[in-house]
């Protein structure tokens, strides 16, 4: 039974958006552009699906998010559709999936703690803005200088607020759909998002990052080719 589960885990995968947008994919696939990387990714998935029956899923919400990102970053419609043709788009059955109450409780506690940290970050930057206002009074500084100072404070606020409230935490419907779908189909979640993977693993879902996923697929393809050669040699000598 354990062997059968392992075999299933090796051939069922659910992708989140980062599985297609990870900046390391270009070098791993030997591509000079994102468009070329998507085309090579499509060829790789197609090959292992044909050779091993590997199943690759993606929720509709993730599909739309990935599509918007890729098409706005130089990927052609043809390349994206070539990739999407080998991915099964399936929504999770949200009304049937059960999540343990302890996990929901831990998640709510983390949200509360992060909101408190975010509030402290906001308060700190309000104080900085107030102090800067005294240093850059209208009669002693140009409008451009005040704008630059305020812009620097706002950028710092955004960066630190994002770090305090979102980094390392599941924070979108798209990510949640990917986790739920992986739980439903009993597959491996492919994501480079620390928070998404942590939430998935709390539910017992195995997760790997995109480079590992590429490595697994390439390994399967190499095994398929060497196995095919071995079978041909055995047949010729018999």
Curated annotation (Swiss-Prot):
Top EC class for this record: hydrolase
Reaction(s) this enzyme catalyzes, per UniProt: Endonucleolytic cleavage of RNA, removing 5'-extranucleotides from tRNA precursor
Keyword Kinase attached: no
GO biological process: one example: tRNA 5'-leader removal
GO MF assignments: ribonuclease P activity
Ubl conjugation as UniProt keyword: no
Coiled-coil intervals: none
EC number, as in UniProt: 3.1.26.5
InterPro entries: RNA_free_RNase_P (IPR014856)
Recorded family membership: Belongs to the HARP family.
NCBIfam families named among the record's database cross-references: PRK04358.1-6, RNA_lig_partner
Protein name per the record: RNA-free ribonuclease P
Species: Hyperthermus butylicus (strain DSM 5456 / JCM 9403 / PLM1-5)
């Amino acid at each position: 039974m354990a062997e059968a589960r392992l075999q299933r885990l090796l051939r069922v995968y659910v992708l989140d958006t980062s599985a297609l947008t990870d900046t390391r994919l270009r070098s791993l696939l030997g591509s000079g552009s994102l468009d070329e990387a998507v085309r090579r990714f499509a060829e790789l998935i197609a090959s292992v699906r044909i050779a091993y029956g590997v199943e690759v899923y993606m929720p509709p919400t993730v599909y739309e998010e990935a599509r918007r990102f890729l098409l706005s970053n130089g990927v052609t419609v043809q390349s994206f559709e070539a990739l999407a043709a080998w991915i099964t788009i399936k929504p999770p059955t949200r009304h049937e999936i059960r999540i343990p109450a302890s996990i929901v409780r831990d998640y709510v506690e983390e949200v509360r703690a992060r909101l408190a940290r975010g509030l402290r970050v906001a308060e700190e930057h309000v104080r900085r803005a107030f102090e800067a206002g005294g240093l850059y009074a209208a009669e002693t500084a140009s409008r451009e200088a005040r704008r630059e100072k305020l812009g620097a404070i706002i950028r710092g606020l955004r960066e630190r607020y994002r770090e305090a409230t979102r980094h390392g935490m599941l924070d979108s419907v798209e990510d949640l759909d990917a986790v739920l779908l992986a739980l439903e189909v009993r597959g491996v979640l492919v994501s480079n998002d620390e928070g998404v993977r942590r939430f998935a693993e709390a539910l017992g879902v195995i997760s790997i990052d995109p480079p590992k996923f590429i490595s697994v697929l390439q390994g399967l393809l190499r095994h398929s080719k060497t196995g095919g050669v071995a079978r041909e040699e055995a047949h010729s000598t018999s």
